[in-house]
Each structure stands twice: as C-alpha cells, then as structure tokens.
Amino acid sequence: MRKYGIIGKPLEHSYSARYFTDKFIREGVDAEYRLYERDDLSDIAVLMQALHGFNVTYPYKQSIMPYLHAIDDVAQAIGAVNVVCQGKGYNTDWIGFKESITPHLLDTDKRVLILGTGGVSKAVQYALQQMGMTFTLVSRYPNAHAIGYDNITEQVIQSHSVVVNCTPLGMLPDIYSLPPIPYEYITDRHLLYDCVYNPERTAFLQEGEAKGARIVNGKDMLYLQADAAYEIWKN
C-alpha cells in the first residue's frame, strides 16, 4: 500500500483526506491518505521516506524547499511547493487557481489586487503572469514590492476589478476574520476570489456579495490542484 498525506497546520479545515481517499477507491488504487499536522518540519526527512507523496499547505509551502532533494522548474520559479513526490517538489496551486478563476473573468478584468505575499500568493502571481494580467501586492509588511493595507484607497479598489485573498483569514475555525480592506468601495463590477475553501462563504466573500460583486471560493482551486498532484504521483 502506498502512503500519502498532507503536511501543515492547522489541518482541521482540510478536505484533502476525504478527496484523495474517495479518488483512490474510485480508481482502485491501494493507497491511504492521512493528515500530518506539525508545529515544525523537524521530522520531514522521516516523512519523506515513509510517504510516496504528499501535499504541503500553510505555513510550510516555502520553508519546506531546503529539505527537498530536487525542485521542479516551475515550483522554483514560483518560490513555493505544494506537492512532493519521492523527495522532489512541485507546484500545482497555480494550475488550480488559473483554471478555476478563468471562467469567472470578464474582458474588463485586467488588474488584480492580491492580498498576501506567502506561498499561495506566489502561485497566484505566477498564474496571472501566464495569463497576461497585471497585479498589485498587499502585505502586512509593505515594501518595495507590496503596498500596505493602509494604502488601499478608493482609487486602488476602483482600478483593480479583481481582488484575491491569499491569506488564511476567514479559514475555519477563525471564520469571522477577514482582510482589512475598504469594502465600501467594492461594487458589482468587482470579482472577489478567496483561496480559502472552508467555509465556502467566508466573511470576505460575504462582504463582496453584499456589494453585488461576483464571488468565487477556493474549492475548485483545491480540487484542480489536487487532480494535478495526483497525476504527478501516478506518473
């Protein structure tokens, strides 16, 4: 029996075990998938030996990279890993994001406001670059590459018709938290996309919905990146 899993913290919100267990059953694969919630990566070498492959989630998508034997070129370019197979790191988050947001985009959607600068954000940035879209980064720690939340003015909101939450804010169990942006400037011309998928309607998306915006959660992104991860493990 091949063993798979997901490493991160927290994992109580994760759908991955259910998703992959069902997939293994449907495809007649002799495998199991478990959750490996960890406070750090001190036993990552042991896990890499024990598991044929695994997913990596918050907060380890970047910090796991030095432990890997090899890294795929795309994951290296992104600067984050969410899939490991036999010690090699890959990134399928960008595929999941690109394929899940594309059906919801209008011709007028050209500029994207990305909330957060972590591992998921890096995959989103890469996907948008492949799609030919421009973006502005927002960080709790503004720098030469990212503005701060205090810098999000009405003009910034109006000039970015797509807002993507790449932070864990609003994720179970902290369902009432949300990124501190001026939601009063969101209109029905906007698309709010949340990479969080549990709960399905986060506080961030509820604010957008109340303003008439299109809203999309991260559930399709999860499944699409998982399908791409499965293909890596299978092949």
Model regions: which residues?
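Phosphate/diphosphate ligand-binding glycine-rich loop within oxidoreductases
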Residues: 2-104
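Short glycine-rich anion-binding loops that position phosphate/pyrophosphate groups of nucleotides
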Residues: 53-63, 120, 168-171, 198
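NAD(P)-binding Rossmann-fold cofactor-contacting core
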Residues: 130-147
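Rossmann-like adenosine-cofactor binding region
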Residues: 145-216, 220
